[in-house]
């Protein structure tokens, strides 16, 4: 089953076309990497796939449904940027309130148990963690 389908996806910033008719099928259970030189559109493509950006042309489907402005589909997609400055000042335990508001199925006890199992002190700020620890904490809520 195709979980991600891109059909002739194009995206420009002003007059500069960044994505040039991308076509891609990702099958359920497969693993893929996205590599390329700086500025070639990797982050733009990921942000289009996750529905953060809208493509200018083409179609992006997650499990057969359009992703942009589709909360039902976005609830199935998780994304944590390589650098996530938005949450740096938060303590891990403060993230609980944020997660409760953003994710209806968020389980506070499971989140605390998870952080304890990987040795994270929930009183620490995100910026006090290693990059891997911070990503683990932020990825926890990915569907």
PLM region spans:
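Short coil-to-beta microelement around the adenine-binding A-loop and adjacent beta1/P-loop entry
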Residues: 16-17, 71
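Helix-to-loop junction immediately C-terminal to a conserved catalytic motif
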Residues: 50
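Conserved ABC transporter NBD signature motif
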Residues: 58-73
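ABC-family P-loop ATPase nucleotide-binding domains
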Residues: 81-137
């Amino acid at each position: 089953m195709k979980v991600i389908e891109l059909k002739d996806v194009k995206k420009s910033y002003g007059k500069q076309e960044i994505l040039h008719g991308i076509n891609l099928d990702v099958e359920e259970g497969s693993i893929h990497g996205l590599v390329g030189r700086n500025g070639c559109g990797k982050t733009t493509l990921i942000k289009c796939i996750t529905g953060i950006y809208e493509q200018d042309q083409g179609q992006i489907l997650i499990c057969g449904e359009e992703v942009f402005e589709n909360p039902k589909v976005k609830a199935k997609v998780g994304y944590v940027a390589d650098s996530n400055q938005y949450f740096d000042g938060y303590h891990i335990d403060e993230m609980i309130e944020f997660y409760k508001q953003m994710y209806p199925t968020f389980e506070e006890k499971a989140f605390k148990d998870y952080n304890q199992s990987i040795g994270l002190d929930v009183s620490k700020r995100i910026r006090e963690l290693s990059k891997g620890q911070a990503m683990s904490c932020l990825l926890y809520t990915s569907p």
